[in-house]
Amino acid sequence: MEKPVRFPDVMLLAAGHGMRLRPLTETIPKPLVPVLGVPLIERVMAVARHEGATRFVANAHYRADQLLAHFGGLLKVNREPELLETGGGVKAALPMLVSDPFFVMNTDVFWLPGADRPLSRMLARRQTDAQIVLLCVQPGRATGFARSHDFCLDPHGRVTRDWGAPVIYAGVALLGKDHFAETPDGPFSLNLLLDKALEDENLVGVVLDTPWFHVGDVGALAETERILSA
């Protein structure tokens, strides 16, 4: 009997200061900010677990001890003495990631578990090792996002700058360790990898088919809680 394929690891980006969520983040790290009593990072992990994720790795910097204490050793955490940004944070944690490819998830965005299964569709969409798959959301389904859009998605599911349907990057990417082979040591943004994949026509997208919440500031937190309480 063929051995079932294990769901990829999930890398959780959890190192930022969360300045726009002050005063809440003056005493707790941003991933532990509660939304209707549930910490943001737990909401993100819940949507991944619903699709089969079992192994999570996070980076931490600001109030890292609180994040470690919250999970009591149940979450693998790579502590950053200095902020490494999104790309540098993932690269530093690569030795802790077992699967290849793996998911990278922001810890300030989520949707309701069971409302859609986008991670599984992202896995099915990735056809070559060179591809990076982004989770995208239509602007009309987004809460807490100030800009009109990030990218466009053409009829074939390819991500472009300006041709196709406007979409927002929903804070989830599926990529491989080889994408980091020629990246710098130290801080850098994941945008470095996305720009390269876009230039090489290796950036593709999957559209989330349910409301999406971005809790980036106190206003977005209040609006998200209002919607979820309705």
Residue ranges and their predicted role:
Residues 62, 133-150:
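Short beta-strand-to-loop element that shapes/binds the nucleotide-sugar donor at the catalytic cleft/hinge
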Residues 103, 110, 114-127, 139-143, ...:
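Catalytic-core segments of class I nucleotidyltransferases/pyrophosphorylases
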Residues 31, 74-76, 202-204:
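Conserved beta-strand segments of alpha/beta enzyme cores
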